[in-house]
Swiss-Prot record:
Major localisation: membrane
Keywords attached to this entry: Cell membrane, Membrane, Transmembrane, Transmembrane helix
Regions annotated as coiled coil: none
Subcellular location: Cell membrane
Transmembrane segments: 33-53, 89-109, 127-147, 154-174, 193-213, 247-267, 285-305, 320-340, 355-375, 382-402, 411-431, 455-475
Protein name: Uncharacterized protein UU048
A GO cellular-component term linked to this record: plasma membrane
Keyword Cell membrane: yes
Alphabetical list of NCBIfam families matching this protein: MSC_0624_12TM (NF045937)
Organism of derivation: Ureaplasma parvum serovar 3 (strain ATCC 700970)
Topology of this chain in the membrane: Multi-pass membrane protein
């Protein structure tokens, strides 16, 4: 009888283990499928938005001028703030862009993040996956279909944020009860959830009420900058020097920053409890790779924009061809890095050495690109150099991350910041080339600073970040060598 019970118990344990293993494998398959589907949709969304950027992101629309947010089918007046008419049109374009972009990016990133957190409970997360994807798709489609120039209609886009908040609220409640079972120590306290949701609601309320007040305090809801008391009051606060206005500004920014911090209480709680580990950051890098892939494909399209005065000379301007050598230099650096890295793999290597090699390579690339762009005035040359160099930089990052499995979380976060900066630089160069094309003739990014344009500022920032990192590593490397030498001297003295 005892043997029969023991045999039954053993069978039960084996069955439970097999069932659990099958469930994990099934959840892993579903998770990988959803991640692949989301990746394909994300890449498609970004590629289409960028290829049709002048029509979608800048609001030119499709078809005749009646379906455009600009007066003419050109971006020549984009960010022209010299008249109330252009000021209002540009404000509405920027407002539309920020609302739709925020909703699109937030929902896509949220889905990628949640797929990581719910690897074991993926089936239960499926409804939220679909709903977040639906909101992302709506935002994407509105970029292609919504081109209203009426303030009230454009301001109605904020209600997308209300829908997003309600979805977030339902997800956070679901996540709290699910995570409470798997990680009771971290999710035992529901106060963080309540604080985050309350302050998110207050921020949303501010975003919704502000446009409503704006359009209802003027003589006409169709005019935002003419005979509008709200606009006049805002201008006075920022321009009229008085103690009252100073206190209002300080109080506004203080409460805004406080509300933003408290609205992200859950995030800070996870950071403090070290839930954002190396694997989580690597998961984020996948989204960055998708974004870079879209930028890479789009830049190939950007080369097609006509610049009659920017054609490359055929043998009559040797200096320009010297500038283009930056691209060949970047490729040579990549080859040398790959050869050196492969050679090092055959011998024992330290993580500090490999990191130093990475940072030196990135610093050389960012410095050479900045210097060439600083002295070169041809947009097409800058576009070629940036296109090649950033591709090399991202390739170097990819090689380093692929070959080093035990990168610290802090370093991964820093590399992530540098990658985002590289992508932003590439996007700005692409948009600058689009705006300065013959059809649009807009030099917005070139007129921000008298001595340096926005592209050069971004490249300088990229170099500065790499230079700061290499300075830190050089000091750390010197300290390690000093400690080793000191230890060797002590050992030699003991032997004597």
């Amino acid at each position: 009888m005892m043997n029969t019970k023991t045999f039954t118990s053993v069978n039960r344990v084996i069955y439970d283990d097999n069932y659990s293993l099958k469930q994990q494998q099934k959840s892993s398959f579903i998770n990988q499928f959803l991640k692949g589907l989301l990746s394909a949709i994300t890449l498609l969304f970004f590629i289409l938005l960028l290829i049709f950027a002048e029509n979608t992101l800048f609001g030119l629309g499709f078809g005749d001028e009646n379906k455009s947010m600009m007066i003419s089918k050109s971006l020549n007046a984009f960010f022209d703030l010299h008249s109330p008419k252009y000021l209002q049109l540009n404000f509405l374009i920027v407002f539309r862009f920020f609302i739709l972009s925020f909703t699109l990016f937030y929902t896509l990133i949220k889905n990628f993040t949640n797929l990581y957190w719910h690897r074991a409970t993926i089936k239960k997360y499926l409804p939220w996956f679909v709903l977040y994807l639906v909101i992302a798709t709506i935002s994407f489609l509105l970029f292609f279909t919504f081109f209203s120039v009426w303030p009230k209609e454009v301001f109605n886009l904020v209600f997308l944020l209300l829908v997003l908040f309600l979805l977030n609220l339902s997800y956070e409640i679901f996540n709290y009860f699910i995570s409470k079972k798997t990680n009771p120590l971290l999710y035992d306290n529901y106060k963080n959830l309540i604080i985050a949701m309350v302050f998110q609601a207050l921020l949303l309320l501010f975003v919704i009420i502000t446009p409503l007040v704006w359009i209802n305090t003027g003589k006409s809801p169709n005019f935002l900058f003419v005979d509008n008391r709200f606009y006049t009051r805002i201008v006075d606060i920022f321009t009229v020097q008085s103690g009252k206005n100073f206190i209002i500004l300080i109080a506004f920014f203080f409460f805004l920053i406080t509300f933003i911090v408290l609205a992200n209480t859950n995030f800070f709680a996870l950071v403090i409890n070290k839930r954002y580990d190396r694997n989580y950051v690597k998961n984020n890098l996948w989204f960055i790779l998708l974004l870079f892939s879209a930028i890479f494909i789009w830049l190939l399209r950007v080369f097609a924009y006509k610049h009659e005065n920017e054609n490359l000379p055929v043998g009559n301007n040797h200096l320009l061809w010297v500038y283009i050598l930056q691209s060949f230099f970047a490729i040579i650096i990549l080859i040398l890095y790959m050869v050196f890295t492969l050679k090092k793999r055959l011998s024992v290597k330290s993580s500090l050495n490999t990191l130093l090699n990475l940072v030196v390579t990135q610093t050389i690339l960012s410095l050479s690109l900045f210097l060439v762009t600083l002295f070169n005035s041809k947009s097409v040359v800058s576009l070629i150099n940036v296109f090649i160099t950033i591709t090399v930089q991202m390739s170097v990052f990819g090689i380093y991350i692929f070959q080093n499995k035990n990168i610290s979380t802090k370093l991964l976060v820093l590399l992530k910041v540098i990658m985002i900066l590289i992508i932003l630089t590439a996007a700005i160069v692409g948009f600058d080339y689009l705006l300065t094309s013959d059809h649009h003739n807009n030099y917005l990014f070139s007129n921000i600073q008298p001595k340096m344009n926005l592209v050069q500022i971004m490249l300088l920032l990229n170099f500065s970040l790499n230079f700061t990192l290499i300075s830190y590593l050089t000091i750390k490397f010197a300290m390690v060598i000093f400690k080793i030498n000191k230890l060797n001297k002590e050992l030699n003295n003991e032997k004597k």
